[in-house]
């Protein structure tokens, strides 16, 4: 069974939650939101949410359950020489894999295989967790892009969160609940909870990213179609294709 068939067998007809790392989740939502996340049949965490150090924060707001970690596994340093790749350790933190839950699916939702380098580094640990790895096929990747483009034209590689929303919808869930990702609509709270990045990674990007939103006229801020994704997210919410939390529902009302 390839990874897409495996995912479809888990997702089709089920209640699915996608939970991202936005800080508003622990600032604006009730402290039983984590229990609500855990009540879904399948929970998908995004990108660097492999391990959360703050267990109280996790339990109350983001949930302790996860079946799939959907990620770009983009461990490369694309933030310039001011950021030390080996200090911020995005996807290269041994602690993440040591604390990985058994039988987790590690899904690279882009048609490449960056995880292979991570796997080589932590093979013994990852194998001990009986984790399943797979990356999307080019065909399904383009099919997902086609779906997103039907809603709003995108001309850059989508973010992990938006790709996973599209992919899950194509797998026909009974319900898809999305929380913890705003496509950088939120200007009140940081885009990531504390300790999502190790060290002062976000601070080093302050010339074009203030921790909340990007300055879209700066070169390093244009590698994803953030503004187009905001329109896609709003369309999905307004047309009842996905369910979202109360804070995110209010945020998308800003989108024209």
Predicted regions and their residues:
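Metal-ion/cofactor- or nucleotide/acyl-coenzyme-handling active-site neighborhoods
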Residues: 1-256
